[in-house]
């Protein structure tokens, strides 16, 4: 399955909620969802009532789109979360939040996760002093992520830092913008991830059918 490369604003409209996929633009009056808060297409303004399956499917699609993950990989995360001891929902969110592209975004070195994935792919980051160019690389507590010295003048990174400098970072991450680095302190607790607009239990139920 190919990665979606179309207009990401259509994804927000499809899910009926802001997914903040374009970063800075999502906070302005240019946001496509604010201007047209209905599904794309000829019949987009006529939303039908969803079945229980439809609700679960939409929840799953929403989480995938927020984190920019394809179906097979997301399914593997769910399987891994189910096999681990403890709350499956928390296990899943910890796997998603530990991805390198997500952590780069959370630290504020990218405007959105899509941009973070591209920057990681192009080798602009070090993890514990070593170059890692795999967006799905899973970080462990106390891992240090750093912008490579030769990448610190890249305009999109500088712009992201400027945009995020005054914004609060999440409690499981520590950031030092002046030195272009941050630390993944620990895995987050489920209740700490407050910007996920769906109930993960609904997602788990979709894969438990």
Curated annotation (Swiss-Prot):
Gene3D superfamilies reported for this sequence: Ribosomal Protein S4 Delta 41, Chain A, domain 1, RNA-binding S4 domain
A GO MF term: rRNA binding
BP terms from Gene Ontology: ribosomal small subunit biogenesis; translation
Keyword Ribonucleoprotein: yes
Keywords: Ribonucleoprotein, Ribosomal protein, RNA-binding, rRNA-binding
PROSITE patterns: S4 (PS50889)
Superkingdom: Bacteria
Keyword RNA-binding set for record: yes
GO cellular component, one term: small ribosomal subunit
InterPro entries the record matches: Ribosomal_uS4, Ribosomal_uS4_bac-type, Ribosomal_uS4_N, S4_RNA-bd, S4_RNA-bd_sf
S4 RNA-binding domain: residues covered: 98-166
CDD domains: S4
NCBIfam families xrefs: PRK05327.1, rpsD_bact
Oligomeric form and interacting partners: Part of the 30S ribosomal subunit. Contacts protein S5. The interaction surface between S4 and S5 is involved in control of translational fidelity.
Known role: One of the primary rRNA binding proteins, it binds directly to 16S rRNA where it nucleates assembly of the body of the 30S subunit.
Family assignment from sequence similarity: Belongs to the universal ribosomal protein uS4 family.
HAMAP family attached to this UniProt entry: Ribosomal_uS4_B
Protein's name in the database: Small ribosomal subunit protein uS4
Species for this entry: Thermotoga neapolitana (strain ATCC 49049 / DSM 4359 / NBRC 107923 / NS-E)
